[in-house]
Structure formats: structure tokens, C-alpha cells
């Protein structure tokens, strides 16, 4: 399946008003035509005054038809008009991902099933950029060695995809935790695990990574993942 990831950066002080309009007008209209998003978040750590949301498509041609239907909806026109009045958004970014076989999300509209304890939730969103020709070897080693360790010790993997349109030689994935303390404790345990040391040694010999970027996200009140 395909995952479209969008990141919108707002001018300082303008994001709450934009989110309110999206929750009340733009979001319901989008769900009506595009189906529910996988998740909708604000950035807690990273570049702030940002929202990040992801939506799945089983057929990429469906996306074009669904977007056209939304553009013709009076409620979407209303949303665009009202958000233009407040001038909230400074930058909009989008990229298209394809899920890997071990991604938990494999179908558009797939319902989120919470598998972690507690009532809170934060998301560790990660983007890894690779030297050309090195990504597939890293993914193979990750699926075989690294992922089993993380599934045993970390929180809940939400999705995992490779960039199809946008910066290529890139993977994007996200893990959910009960909170920042939960994340820290689990990652410290992982770092001390012999299985993780084996993974790091294996991928270290490949020399695949060019850059790693992480953000901490918080779900909005209307996010399916929460």
C-alpha cells in the first residue's frame, strides 16, 4: 500500500486556529472522500508549530479521484476559504511512501489497535537517509536481526515505509510509547541487549546511513492513533 505523509508548518500562534478548523470542517470532509487518516499529530520535539499526518491508499489512482471529489465539495471550499483568512500555514511538505512487508499497516482504513499499556501516548517518528545502494541491505538486516529485538523491548511499531516520491533512499517509520519516560527506559534496555549489539555490528559493516532524523509527536484529539 501507499502512505502519504504530510507535514504542515504554521506561523507561530496560528496552529491552534488551523487545527480547530480542520477538526470541525476540513477533517470530516477529508474522511468523507479519502477515508480516515492513519494518524494526526502535532510536533512536540523537533521543528515546532507543525502538524504531521499520514493517510493510506491501496491504489494510488484512487487518490487522484478522491482528491478531485474533495476539491469539489462545498465544505472543502469553505475550509480552504476560512484557513486562508487566518493565514496559518507557512510551509507544506508531502512525500509518498510504500509500506514494507513487516509494516503493521498494510491496508487503507485499517483500524488502529492499541497494544501498549497506560493511557498516554507519544510517537517517536524516524527518518533515515541512506547512501545510494545501501538501503536494501540495511532493511534486510533490520527485519532479520534488529526488528525482533525492538518488538521484544520497545513500544508499538505503527508503520514502516520507504520513500517512493520525495527524497529517495529513505525509510520512514514510527513507534508509539506510553510517554517519554517509557521511551527512554525501553531504548536504554534495547541499547544494552546483545541482539541489538549484533544488529549494530552487522549494519556498521555496511556503512549505509547518511543521516538520521527523529521527532517526538503527540496525537491530536481527533487522531485515530492515541
Question: Language-model segments: what does each one mean?
Answer:
Residues 1-198, 202-226:
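Short S/T/G/P-rich N-terminal loop/turn motif that feeds into the first structured element of a domain
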